[in-house]
Amino acid sequence: MQHPTPDALHARLAARRFILAGPCALEDFDVAMETAHAVREAAEAAGLFAVFKSSWDKANRTSITSFRGPGLVRGMEWLARIREESGLPVVTDIHLPEQAAPVAEVADIIQIPAFLCRQTDLLVAAAATGRVVNVKKGQFVAPWDMRPAVEKLRAAGNERILLTERGTSFGYNNLVVDYRSIPTMQGFGVPVVFDATHSVQLPGGLGGSSGGERRHVPVLARAAVAAGVDGVFLECHPDPDKALCDGPNSWPLDRLPALLKELSALWSLEHVC
């Protein structure tokens, strides 16, 4: 299956109306493949462009016993198969500079986790791959302080950049969304994504793991589209209550089509676009 070049992919993302969607972690190949096909079908029905997302290693879990994923080698094998069989581009994250090159052999978009958004060596390594790079804004970072991350990527020779808003720390075990961050970060000349599922997370809220309030996902996602966001990030799962990672804030896969149609309708409104 032919996939877009990095330049073509970034141009498509800059044209707005897209989603990055999939399970939090690659917990099971069949679940991931089922989700990828469902994401593609729901996105096509809503007239949206889709990218499959999932992590091969969740390095910043709350507990030492938390599920992390299949690891680099198996994770890349799974993502390569999903990419080929679903026809969707894929996005996945890296945590160390040396992971950039092997991940770039498979991933269309390399993602920098929120907690690592200031790590210069990581950003430079991701930029050096030539892939689209999605940097998630740290929960502790002001929107205007993401400009240096963009400048680091550009200084390393990469203009294919996305920034993602995923909520800001609001006291202990809670996040809040300031939608002013969307136009602020768009002002850096890059497309901006809104992470509707991590924004309803309650970090560490369950003691040994994070909680979440998935019932708020639709209203936060709609608000982001109304605020002019370019794309929406959604973690989804066939059975969120049984997911091995971020289940409390993941969106049920069978409810994805309806949500995407709502977002598509909002994107179509002239005053939003």
From Swiss-Prot:
What's the EC number here?
A: 2.5.1.55
Catalysed transformations (reactions): D-arabinose 5-phosphate + phosphoenolpyruvate + H2O = 3-deoxy-alpha-D-manno-2-octulosonate-8-phosphate + phosphate
BP-aspect Gene Ontology terms: keto-3-deoxy-D-manno-octulosonic acid biosynthetic process
InterPro entries recorded? Aldolase_TIM (IPR013785), DAHP1/KDSA (IPR006218), KDO8P_synthase (IPR006269)
Which GO MF terms does the UniProt record name? 3-deoxy-8-phosphooctulonate synthase activity
Q: Name one GO cellular component term.
A: cytoplasm
**A Pfam family:** DAHP_synth_1
Q: Does the keyword Metal-binding apply?
A: no
EC class: transferase
Subcellular compartments: Cytoplasm
Membrane spanning stretches:
none
- Please give the SUPFAM superfamilies that the UniProt record associates with this protein: Aldolase
Q: Which domain of life is it from?
A: Bacteria
* Keywords associated with the record: Cytoplasm, Lipopolysaccharide biosynthesis, Transferase
Pathway field:
Carbohydrate biosynthesis; 3-deoxy-D-manno-octulosonate biosynthesis; 3-deoxy-D-manno-octulosonate from D-ribulose 5-phosphate: step 2/3; Bacterial outer membrane biogenesis; lipopolysaccharide biosynthesis
Q: Which HAMAP family match?
A: KDO8P_synth
Q: Which family does it belong to?
A: Belongs to the KdsA family.
Q: What's the name of the protein?
A: 2-dehydro-3-deoxyphosphooctonate aldolase
Q: What is the originating organism of this protein?
A: Nitratidesulfovibrio vulgaris (strain DP4) (Desulfovibrio vulgaris)
Taxonomically, what lineage is the organism? Bacteria, Pseudomonadati, Thermodesulfobacteriota, Desulfovibrionia, Desulfovibrionales
